[in-house]
Amino acid sequence: MSIKDIITVPDETLKKISEPLEKVSTNEKKLINDLFETMYASNGIGLAAVQIGILKRILVIDVSTKDEKRKPLSFINPVITKVSTETSIYEEGCLSIPDTFIEIERPKICEVEYIDINGEKKNLKCDGLLSTCLQHEINHLDGKLIIDHLSKLKRDIIIKKISKTKKNPDRILV
């Protein structure tokens, strides 16, 4: 297992649609372990393969709190099959958009079909933070980011700020 670099906006890879997998091989299992290690090292609760530059429909999530035992979940080829009409609003952050938090309204409950790390088809119905995180990460697989919920002007301001920080990493932001 190894910690990978997380790509950030404005990297165009993040806007690409990830490809489904035909089967789960040793390489995909290693990738899932790398995603978990990278996510935990970055204090994240979810990470999609595209965020480390790999265009495969794989994502990992762990919404457990620091006081709880870890509850890692991995999803291969996840597809949202059903959502509730009731919605909830969470302030979402993203490891690919540093220091940015946006309130986003999403369906409160979602049902997902996916393949697990052992290649078995599974179904999951979830709500709360897990539902929000899963929808967020599946958006990544479809080339959508949380800033896509904003106006073009706000999006451009955030991307410009992040680009400046990349060019001047020692610059202090107040």
PLM feature spans:
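Positively charged
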Residues: 1-174
